UniProtKB/Swiss-Prot annotation:
Family annotation (InterPro entries): WzyE
Entry keywords, A to Z: Cell inner membrane, Cell membrane, Membrane, Transmembrane, Transmembrane helix
Reported function: Probably involved in the polymerization of enterobacterial common antigen (ECA) trisaccharide repeat units.
Protein name: Probable ECA polymerase
Sequence intervals crossing the membrane: 3-23, 37-57, 65-85, 119-139, 154-174, 181-201, 206-226, 227-247, 340-360, 377-397, 409-429
GO cellular component terms given for this protein: plasma membrane
Record's bilayer topology term: Multi-pass membrane protein
Species assigned in the record: Photorhabdus laumondii subsp. laumondii (strain DSM 15139 / CIP 105565 / TT01) (Photorhabdus luminescens subsp. laumondii)
Length: 459
């Protein structure tokens, strides 16, 4: 990359960055937080944060990068995608109705407590089962890629670890005080560190817990935007340190700075992967919607499907194995836009932008229902569901549409099952006479009025 080429790229990058930041800041001033703001920040992190890191690697360490044409196309495609997404998100699909609608479901105190206990139990039990089968993998494996090898059993259990976070979100939203906010951080980060040691280097739970803590603080006004930026910088350094431990790297001096640049870029902003995919566009045999279907394979146990393929050809694996002919054992993320290109070429980019806009709009709709809900138990469930799905949005931006669809469906099923089981448990305990109502003014308050009713758990 010459200085002239860098100058041209920088102009495009700066225009794109100002465009997205302006729209995001306007939204922030209007509502302070919604999932459009979160997705926009996540999008900036994924597709734009890595550009200065790439430039430092090129000019400071003479690193070979993707051809400039591909980098330019990646920046232009990313900006066009966001523009279409924003229009799709802002388009009103129906007129707002002032007529109250019948609630789909209601919640009471006991049902809500059962729900978060079930969610937490799912996470704790599966971590225990994984540990019993494998021990502390962080101290047993020689390299991170061994996590995906046949010597590690019960890999599917890792999908359940995340449910500890929505469980703690329910606890917080039941009584959103600063004390519970801090408890959320301590409990989820501690659990994330446990999973990091048990699994052997998976940092997702720690990152998500810290990010949720920050965004809840922004929503409540407990931290400022500058505090968020400072905490983000601390988080980046923390993730770099964990990456060094994960890959067993011992670096210092200029080598440490070089390692910091490329690990931070690959962790937070794999935008060069998208450029690399565009550079190999002629090698892509468009997969259609098959990667979405294939990504569900990992949720099907082998005893139920004896002939299940060991290697799932989703968009990330297709990009790694078929396009790049890379069989190192680690999948290279194609990013959100890259997964669309794998499925249907550049024509899928505007279609995907429209669909993503509608998805984020749906999450914001549920979030608003939770904020406006007068039943605080139902409000806690709705808001915990939305904030709990933030991990899936990170997967959407970083990994792609296929990974997002399978994970969000899985998340909804497990969350919904815990909700249904909690209601069944409440019905069983109530039928057995183990739950009774409080008395208010010489009369029993009806269970159907959850705002005025408090259930005592054990009689």
């Amino acid at each position: 990359m010459t200085l002239t080429q860098f100058g041209g790229l920088f102009v495009v990058y700066l225009i794109s960055l100002v465009f997205i930041l302006t729209l995001t800041y306007q939204e922030f001033r209007r509502v302070r937080f919604n999932f459009n703001i979160f997705f926009s920040l996540l999008y900036l992190l994924t597709f734009y944060f890595g550009f200065p890191l790439t430039c430092l690697l090129v000019f400071q360490f003479d690193v070979e990068v993707v051809p400039v044409d591909a980098l330019l196309h990646a920046l232009l495609a990313s900006t066009c995608f966001y523009g279409i997404y924003y229009v799709s998100y802002k388009t009103r699909l129906r007129k707002p109705s002032m007529q109250p609608k019948a609630p789909v479901f209601t919640m009471n105190r006991v049902e809500t407590n059962f729900t978060w206990l079930l969610l937490a139990s799912v996470a704790v039990v599966t971590v225990g089962l994984f540990f019993m089968q494998n021990g502390f993998l962080l101290f047993k494996l020689q390299s991170y890629s061994q996590i995906f090898s046949s010597q590690v059993s019960g890999v599917a259990l890792k999908r359940f670890f995340y449910f500890f976070i929505p469980a703690m979100l329910v606890v917080y939203f039941l009584k959103p005080t600063q004390l519970r906010w801090l408890f959320f951080l301590i409990s989820t980060v501690a659990f994330g560190i446990l999973t990091y040691v048990v699994v052997g280097g998976t940092r997702a739970n720690i990152i998500i817990a810290f990010a949720l803590f920050l965004f809840i603080g922004i929503v409540r006004g407990w931290i400022t935007l500058w505090m968020l930026v400072t905490a983000g910088a601390i988080g980046i350094v923390g993730m770099f340190w964990l990456a060094l431990k994960r890959y067993s790297l011992d670096v210092s001096g200029a080598e440490a700075f070089y390692t910091f640049l490329y690990l931070t870029r690959d962790t937070f902003s794999p935008w060069e992967n998208f450029a690399l995919l565009l550079n190999n566009y002629d090698k892509i045999d468009f997969q259609g919607l098959a990667p979405i279907i294939r990504d569900f394979y990992v949720f099907i146990p082998s005893w139920l499907w004896p002939g299940r393929p060991d290697a799932v050809l989703n968009s990330a694996n297709y990009f790694t194995w078929e396009v790049l002919d890379n069989h190192s054992g680690l999948a290279i993320s194609p990013t959100l836009i890259g997964s669309l290109v794998v499925m249907g070429g550049v024509l899928f980019i505007p279609v995907g932008a429209i669909v993503v806009g509608l998805i984020i709009k749906w999450f914001d709709w549920i979030y608003e229902l939770g904020k406006q809900e007068t039943n605080r138990y139902k409000a806690a469930i709705l808001q915990a569901f939305c904030f709990g799905a933030i991990f899936n949005m990170i997967v959407l931006a970083r990994e792609g549409v296929d990974s997002f669809v399978s994970r969000v469906v899985f998340f909804c099923i497990i969350f919904g099952l815990c909700l249904v089981i909690a209601k069944l448990l409440y019905w069983l305990f109530e039928s057995a006479g183990l739950i009774r109502m409080y008395l208010t003014g010489n009369r029993v308050v009806s269970q159907k009025c959850p705002l005025q009713c408090e259930e005592r758990k054990w009689s």
